[in-house]
């Protein structure tokens, strides 16, 4: 294990910049950590680097594929032959062509996506498939203005016009018009080099957190739920990728933590599910609801010891003129 580096994973709310800080707060007797809203897997990746046994879970299937590729996977990489095979077929009409032509991508690009997916599914190894889908995630997002699938087609076309982009923003953003294959190959080495073995057997799940916590065992649970009052529509941002992988239009999930009025109830439900675990680590920020005082009160019931740490954190939100500067909170709970 030669100091593997977390690859480029565009993910709103990614904890890459503070993953080290969070891991440093883990109690010394922790050996197994469950990352139950794993998202872009930056925390899970850092925990794996530090030798922990990791359980990664996310309700989005594309995030589950990231966890399979980067956390559970200990050795499988994509070879040059694998990549040549993935891109060996001419474009073909299929699910993406039928449902998403001139919605997020041009029709011919959707035909390319259909051909690529068909070949990825022919790879005879789960981890190779996961790596390929992780790289296709990167490619599709690189071609998408603002890196999220909540932009109207008219805006997509406008922002992919390099002359318009240059006149408006001083940058052509030519990468939006590079091919899927170009982006896939450009990022191949960094994703392959992120595959490593820390000596442990890891697990990945694609479940609702409230179901997951009933059947896993871990010394500590790390929670990074969507923050209410922020850009937190993760199904809207990335649900298209789940539809692409499955070949069927996916529906938004329940228990999404987006509704301020529902958030307190969901946290109460979550705390109830966490009772079997010794340590809880909860990431949140200083502008969301429940607020710091409300969360502290909920978490400290029944004699639980709660410590709250904070660090400045800048959220890079694509499509926003100003980066959002908030204070990142980390609630450390010892369930005594």
UniProtKB/Swiss-Prot annotation:
Domain of life: Bacteria
EC numbers on record: 2.1.1.72
Annotated GO biological process: DNA restriction-modification system; methylation
Pfam families per UniProt: MethyltransfD12
Catalyzed reactions: a 2'-deoxyadenosine in DNA + S-adenosyl-L-methionine = an N(6)-methyl-2'-deoxyadenosine in DNA + S-adenosyl-L-homocysteine + H(+)
One Gene Ontology MF term: site-specific DNA-methyltransferase (adenine-specific) activity
Alphabetically ordered keywords of this record: DNA-binding, Methyltransferase, Restriction system, S-adenosyl-L-methionine, Transferase
Gene3D superfamilies: Vaccinia Virus protein VP39
InterPro entries, per the entry: DNA_methylase_N6_adenine_CS, MeTrfase_D12, SAM-dependent_MTases_sf
Note: Both this methylase and M1.HphI protect DNA from cleavage by HphI.
Protein family membership: Belongs to the N(4)/N(6)-methyltransferase family.
Protein name per UniProt: Type II methyltransferase M2.HphI
Provenance organism: Haemophilus parahaemolyticus
